[in-house]
Amino acid sequence: MAESTNLRLRLPLICIILEVILIILFGVLVEYNDDTDAKKWNKNNSTDPATNEFYYRYPSFQDVHVMIFVGFGFLMTFLQRYGFSSMGFNFLIAAFSLQWATLMQGFFHGMHHGKIHVGVTSMINADFCTGAVLISFGAVLGKTSPVQLLVMAILEVTLFAVNEYILLSILGANDAGGSMTIHTFGAYFGLMVTRILHRPNLDKSKHKNSSVYHSDLFAMIGTIFLWMFWPSFNSAITQYGDPQHRTAANTYYSLAACTLATFGFSSLVNPEGKLDMVHIQNAALAGGVAVGTAGEMMLTPFGSMIVGFLAGTISVLGYKYLTPFMESKLKIQDTCGIHNLHGMPGILGAIVGAVTAALASRDVYGNGLDKVFLEAADNSQWSAQTKGGFQAISLAVTLGIALIGGLITGFLLKLPIYGTPPDTQCFEDAVYWEVPGEEEDHHELNEVSTQNEVEKLNS
């Protein structure tokens, strides 16, 4: 076991090679945008520095960044002996993914005269892409090596950028909060990967695939950070003014309604009426996922609350009934239950977005219609029903790319070259980390065993 999981050559090799390649590509392809470059900014905007996009976008970026590194990281620390890996590997793949995403998204969206322009908006978008990778990470948590995760990130970020380009640039979809591009894509990509990586003997580590009191408390820290900052996440790249304001408000009320639904149904599905911490940690966030696409639209506060309530309901029911079915019948071993937090609520959000877009009119939006649906300003033949149709097509495209991409990635990750943990050592930090106290515990265990053997001989 020790030899097969030894990463002394594998991990340094892939980390160093990837970072060297990234540095070279950044040196050749990347430059500051007009709001970041000293010469361009001071030439074009010599009056008021407060008009720089930094002051409009950075507060949202800061919140999103905390969600990626603190929220997602702590949320996955629920496993009793996998806290180092949950936080550490989250840190590793996020740091890589945001760099690779800058290049991939820039290639499709931000090329200017052969250069990729970066600034605070591109940083937010890179974090969004990273979020999709971390969602997929949740499906394979505890069963993969960091080398596998980096390879998965390379492929997923690339396909994320392709899917995002098709949805936003070709189909003209609205998806500022990422119900489709982030949550649905990340969830079904990860579910397909974990299906291909199915471990028939994972029961050998079943006792470690659970939480203890303090690990659930740590995970709840992640939940609270995500819950508080989700309005910033959904509104981060929306248009300034009323669309951004409306998105934050819709997310705010959706999350609140979702939380009450989560507590209610968590108690309802338990024969003794007790709450399940897994439901509270995860399903309470589903409202933020489900309102991501329609958040900037005139969904109304009560509409947002209905969406949040539905999201919390299907998420709890998914954890209670669907996850066990998927594992036993479909052989999908979804460690974090991403299908319930991101998959189904993401699809719900896409459907809500399509319906809300199809019902849009100037009677409701006034001149604000052109700010939410940008193509309406340039096309006199624009139709809300057609827009709703393209939103629905975008969901189908996302599911197709995610499932096919996850299938290919899963088979690549099955190659026996990554130092993956054996079935008996899944969900265990000590496979890849120096864990304080492990050597002492092992020494004490040997002493006790020796003492017992001596006592048996003497008797």
Curated annotation (Swiss-Prot):
Molecular functions (GO terms): ammonium channel activity
Keyword Repeat: no
Gene Ontology biological process terms in this record: ammonium homeostasis; ammonium transmembrane transport
Protein name (record): Ammonium transporter Rh type B
Protein location: Basolateral cell membrane; Cytoplasmic vesicle membrane
PANTHER family: AMMONIUM TRANSPORTER, AMMONIUM TRANSPORTER RH TYPE B
Extracellular-side segments: 32-58, 109-121, 171-176, 238-248, 296, 362-392
Species whose genome carries this gene: Danio rerio
